[in-house]
UniProtKB/Swiss-Prot annotation:
GO terms under cellular component: endoplasmic reticulum membrane; plasma membrane; vesicle
Gene that specifies this protein: ANO5
Note: The term 'anoctamin' was coined because these channels are anion selective and have eight (OCT) transmembrane segments. There is some dissatisfaction in the field with the Ano nomenclature because it is not certain that all the members of this family are anion channels or have the 8-transmembrane topology.
Source organism (scientific name): Homo sapiens (Human)
Protein name: Anoctamin-5
Membrane-traversing stretches: 300-320, 381-401, 463-483, 512-532, 558-578, 680-700, 733-753, 835-855
Effect listed in the UniProt record for changing T513I: In GDD; uncertain significance
Consequence the record notes for mutating E202K: In LGMDR12; uncertain significance
Extracellular side: 321-380, 484-511, 579-679, 754-834
Listed result of changing K259N: In LGMDR12; uncertain significance
Length: 913
């Protein structure tokens, strides 16, 4: 107070505000934080009162002049690590919520966190309070040790992977090294506040990255108590969010995604991510994985690593699949079967039996000429090769992913990973329902416990609900089948009688028309059922009262995957393994519910229909999913910002801008994995019928990566950084689907495609040595005597021919075993079963050999891990040794001499014994 300059300023300020001092005092105090008011002095005298007012006015001036994009407290020094928000509530439980918040925030301050509250009058809606949280150095170092966060102790001497010749070829897809490797490589060790000198601490404000800071704060928030209710201690931000005591809790983004930060804000990694990752013009570039991990945490980072690796592996499958498709395209015009079907002298002379009862007429085989050519695109010799190739590809994918995962564990310091504490934390819903407690064998503390007998009813309810919804899926599939059966006759009679459709009959047959409309209808039903089941599955999982967040996610994963499996794949299984297999024959057809005649396959086979079904469902799901992922958060955020459509940067503070973004939610990654694994099923389970499936998946994933990056960077709040060392239970699901895919593709080749019957004819029944496939079409069609039609199935119009043909291997009407399966049928069946056994054994043998030959952890990674452990131990040893020297107060020579004396004494004592 003795500084003359300061006294002069005080005098000037006092003259200006003397008349309004009381009013200014009241207004300024309402807008200052508790920490700011702590700078004030005792106001017993007028000069002191004026001095306090001066400080308040200066603090208010700083507040008003603070950049709206600032991520600091009003002092411009303390960084905001987390934000809580709540709405001014006038409901009857408002007082209870206010008491909870007061107790919670008081306890947060007791842990060492610093809080600053933004009044609702400063918010855009005039209703929302914001609580800004800062973790000071002492809090960070304490909880970094508790969480076992690894921090750098020395720059690594292990060189990064060297450039290979292929690296120069891939130059255009590479990112700048400053983006790909934003930080140098370090040897790391678990942080210890008692060994701070060991760590490379250049600046305390930037030593802990923002992801580690928000992880530490969230750890405190999730354990901070807020009172005792019903005789139980209540704690955790999640419980307060569930009760709407707080409306949201989130860490701040670094800044705007469309421009770099201005001082004093730190480097804007969000902007860097948007520029180099979240733009669609960078679709061909690699991902900045280290930067993603640094900003969002390992759990989100590993999802993008997996999606990127899966996409890279799809490239090889897509190339082979495209080659198989091109082979089918080039050989389409030279295919003997299609040539015979299209030949007026062969296919044009073959009268086929009606495809439905009474209303359908006889038809000539060459009317399916174009359809048979299309069928050859996917049903040719390359189908067998591609089915075997994909069985091997999926093994290579999973084995190389294990290697990639092991390398990732080393690069991201996850070698000694332990499950995230918050994932193992008890759910508030579980605690609320528990009436018993028992001793935890590990922690030796009493914890809530729910006996099994109290949960059994909920398990039964859960199982019954899942079974009911799966039954509903099957019922909907049967309904679509009934639709196909009922409209097939309508399409057939309509297309036969309408002369205007003559031009399209060659490629739009009743079978294809029914298949297209049925597949589209099935896709719509799938989306509707999926929408409702997502809500139902979340509800029944909550009813099971899972103990931890990890148990909740695992239970939900199982339910959702089982439903998705049945919902998306059931129609494909029907077309692949049931359609056309139990038709019967003319005069003795099989009927669904004794009313609708079973569907038949096209003379060219059922594979083209499976291809159609797979294409519509897979492509439709991917397009719909990407549109929904992009538009949904965009629309919600626009609605929240509708009051500030222009120049929102000036209207909103940084915390309010982030508050108005959509929350990614605790299950955000769950749905991303579910979508990817469902696509993986389409690519592997039925790929023999559609070699272009990997190409479609590749294109979708290239878009998916950028859509996910864009929405995370621009449309969602920043997520709390979480650790994960693998993709979790999804890896087991992928392994299960990989094994199942070998069987499904073997059965598709054997029973759905026409490859095996052709091979049997080629080697056993062909009589033409120069062109062995000549006569195959005639051989594959059996003969039926029209007079044998029952009255209720025969066409209403009489014809002058006496026989018709149908697809099967049966004796002709003039044989003593008429209409029974002939010997060729059994030969073909034996060949099909043999093929399945041989293919499965060959593929599984190759799979096991590859799994044995490819190590789970690459050799160079093993060496790097050993090197880092050795160097870490050495650095820790040297640190402790130097510390011991300092404590003993002796120099290095004296210390060495002291050690030698002690060693000599020990040897002497040993020799005397």
């Amino acid at each position: 107070m003795g500084d003359p300059d300061l006294l002069e300023v005080l005098a000037e300020e006092g003259e200006k505000v003397n008349k309004h001092i009381d009013y200014s005092f009241q207004m300024s105090e309402q807008s200052l934080s508790s920490r700011e008011t702590s700078f004030l002095i005792n106001e017993e005298t007028m000069p002191a009162k004026r001095f306090n007012l001066f400080l308040r006015r200066r603090l208010m001036f700083q507040k008003n002049q603070q950049s709206k994009d600032s991520i600091f407290f009003r002092d411009g020094i303390r960084q905001i690590d987390f934000v809580l928000s709540y709405v001014d509530d006038v409901k009857k439980d408002a007082e209870l919520k206010a008491e909870r918040r007061k107790e919670f925030e008081t306890n947060l301050r007791k842990t060492g966190l610093e809080l600053e509250i933004e009044d609702k009058r400063d918010s855009e809606d005039g209703r929302t309070y914001f609580v800004k949280i800062h973790a000071p150095w002492e809090v960070l170092v304490t909880y970094a040790e508790v969480l076992g966060i690894k921090m750098p102790i020395k720059e690594s001497d292990i060189p990064r992977p060297k450039h290979t010749p292929i690296s120069y070829v891939l130059g255009p897809v590479r990112l700048p090294l400053s983006v790909k490797y934003p930080h140098p490589e370090y040897f790391t060790a678990q942080f210890s506040r008692h060994r701070q000198e060991l760590f490379l601490i250049e600046d305390q404000a930037t030593f802990f990255p923002s992801s580690s800071r928000n992880r530490i704060v969230y750890y405190i928030l999730s354990r901070c108590p807020f009172g005792i209710e019903d005789g139980k201690k209540r704690f955790g931000i999640e419980r307060l969010l569930n009760s709407n005591t707080y409306s949201s809790a989130y860490p701040l983004h670094d800044g705007q995604y469309w421009k770099p930060s201005e001082p004093p804000n730190p480097t804007n990694e969000r902007y860097t991510l948007h520029q180099n990752w979240a733009r669609f013009s960078y679709f061909y570039k690699e991902q900045p994985l280290d930067l993603i991990k640094n900003y969002y945490g390992e759990k989100i980072g590993i999802y993008f690593v997996f999606l990127g690796f899966y996409t890279e592996m799809l490239f090889f499958a897509a190339v082979v699949g495209l080659a198989c498709f091109i082979y089918g395209l080039l050989s389409m015009e030279h295919n003997t079967s299609s040539t015979e079907i299209c030949d007026p002298e062969i296919g044009g002379q073959m009268i086929m039996c009606p495809l439905c009862d009474q209303v359908c007429d006889y038809w000539r085989l060459n009317s399916t000429c174009l359809a048979s050519k299309f069928s050859h695109l996917f049903d040719n010799e390359s189908t067998v090769f591609f089915a075997i190739f994909m069985g091997i590809w999926v093994t290579l994918f999973l084995e190389f992913w294990k290697q990639r995962q092991a390398r990732l564990e080393y690069e991201w310091d996850l070698v000694d990973f332990e499950e995230e504490q918050q994932q193992l934390q008890l759910r508030p819903e579980f605690e609320a329902m528990c009436k018993h407690r028992k001793l935890n064998a590990v922690t030796k503390e009493m914890e809530p416990y729910m006996p099994l007998y109290t949960r059994i009813p909920w398990y039964f309810l859960s199982g019954a609900t899942v079974t009911l919804w799966m039954s509903l899926v099957v019922t909907s599939m049967v309904a679509v089948i009934v639709y196909r059966l009922s409209v097939f006759a309508t399409f057939a009679s309509f297309m036969e009688s309408d002369a205007s459709l003559k031009q399209v009959k060659s490629f739009l047959t009743p079978q294809i028309t029914t298949s297209l409309t049925g597949s589209c209808l099935n896709f719509i039903v799938i989306l509707i059922l999926n929408f409702f089941y997502e809500k139902i599955s979340a509800w029944i999982t909550k009813m099971e009262i899972p103990r931890t967040y990890q148990e909740y996610e695992s239970s939900l994963t199982l339910k959702m995957f089982l439903f998705q499996f049945v919902n998306f794949y059931s129609s494909c299984f029907y077309v692949a393994f049931f359609k056309g297999k139990f038709v019967g024959y003319p005069g003795k057809y099989t009927y669904l519910f004794n009313e609708w005649r079973s569907e038949e396959c096209d003379p060219g086979g059922c594979l083209i229909e499976l291809t159609t079904q797979l294409t519509i469902i897979m492509t439709g799901k991917q397009i719909f999913g990407n549109i929904k992922e992009a538009i949904y958060p965009l629309a919600l955020n626009w609605w929240r910002r509708r009051k500030a459509r222009t120049n929102s940067e000036k209207l909103y503070s940084r915390w309010e801008q982030d508050h108005d973004l959509e929350s990614f939610g605790p299950l955000g990654l769950f749905y991303e994995y579910l979508e990817t694994v469902t696509q993986f099923g389409f690519v592997t389970l039925f790929v023999a019928s559609f070699p272009l499936a990997p190409l479609l998946a590749l294109i979708n994933n290239i878009v998916e990566i950028r859509v996910d990056a864009w929405k995370l960077t621009t449309q969602y709040r920043r997520t709390v950084a979480s650790k994960a060392h693998s993709i979790g239970v999804w890896q087991d699901i992928l392994y299960g689907m990989a094994v199942l895919s070998v069987a499904t593709n073997a059965f598709i080749v054997a029973f759905t495609s026409d490859i095996i019957p052709r091979l049997v004819y080629y080697y056993a029944y062909s009589t033409n040595a120069t062109q062995p496939m000549t006569g195959y079409v005639n051989n594959s069609l059996s003969v039926f005597l029209i007079a044998d039609f029952p009255n209720h199935t025969a066409p209403s119009e009489k014809r002058d021919f006496i026989t018709c043909r149908y697809r099967d291997y049966r004796y002709p009407p003039d044989d003593e075993n008429k209409y029974f399966h002939n010997m060729q049928f059994w030969h073909v069946l034996a060949a099909k079963m043999t093929f399945i056994i041989v293919m499965e054994h060959v593929v599984f043998l190759v799979k096991f050999l590859l799994a044995w030959m490819i190590p789970d952890v690459p050799k160079d990674v093993v060496e790097r891990i050993k090197r880092e452990k050795l160097m870490t131990i050495k650095i820790l040893h040297d640190f402790e040794l130097n510390k011991l020297k300092e404590n003993l107060g002796i120099n290095s020579n004296e210390f060495a001499k002291h050690v030698m004396i002690e060693e000599n004494k020990a040897q002497l004592a040993k020799s005397t014994l």
